[in-house]
A protein has these predicted regions:
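Short, surface-exposed charged micro-motifs
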Residues: 54-56, 82-84, 111-113
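Short, solvent-exposed loop/hinge segments that bridge or flank secondary-structure elements
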Residues: 46-64
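Tryptophan-anchored aromatic micro-motifs
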Residues: 34-51
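Beta-sheet ligand-binding and adhesion/scaffold domains
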Residues: 49, 64-68, 92-160
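N-terminal glycine/threonine-rich, aromatic-flanked beta-hairpin/loop signature
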Residues: 58-86
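Short, low-complexity, disordered segments immediately C-terminal to signal peptides
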Residues: 20-38
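C-terminal motif of bacterial Sec signal peptides marking the signal peptidase cleavage site
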Residues: 15-18
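Positively charged n-region of N-terminal signal peptides that target proteins for export
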Residues: 1-6
């Protein structure tokens, strides 16, 4: 009976050890997959009067966009968050999820549209609505890319 107990204990230890090794391999594989998916990394900066907006954008092999955006607007708390979206034609539609002024208990989410012209991104203005907590552009309402504040130029990601 004593030998059976030792055998079960030994078998349990081997099982636990092999599971832990497998988990570390999965973490390494997930990190490799994440690195492989980011096909292109681009950085943009817009300066308007005393406002500065920085974007670091990752494009994966499927054309999906993700990245970070920091908005430093004069006399306003800094908005720091993530963008996720995709191109539809020459227009990039993203959802910007951010915190304001370092207050992490409340998260905001806004839609944004950028028109791509060469190496420049132009942040458009459009009517937005909120329904049941979801904010989106009003359907069939044009987004204005002419009368805008923020025109982003491509910058080196190291100087951002």
């Amino acid at each position: 009976m004593k030998n059976l107990g030792l055998f079960c204990l030994l078998l349990s230890c081997i099982g636990i050890t092999s599971c832990k090794n497998n988990q570390s391999e999965k973490v390494e594989e997930a990190a490799e997959i994440e690195v492989e998916q980011a096909m292109d990394v681009s950085c943009y900066r817009a300066i308007y009067e005393q406002d500065t907006v920085d974007i670091k954008m990752n494009t994966d092999k499927n054309g999906e966009i993700s990245g970070d955006m920091v908005m430093k607007v004069m006399d306003m708390p800094i908005k720091d968050g993530e963008i996720v979206g995709e191109y539809r034609g020459d227009t990039l539609f993203v959802s910007y999820t951010f915190v304001q002024g370092g207050y992490t208990k409340k998260t905001y989410k806004n839609p944004m549209a950028f028109l791509k012209k060469g190496d420049q991104l132009i942040l458009g203005n459009g009517k937005i609505e909120t329904t049941m907590g979801a904010t989106y552009f009003v359907k069939d309402s044009p987004i204005d890319f002419e009368k805008v504040k923020y025109k982003f130029s491509k910058v080196d990601c190291d100087t951002k």
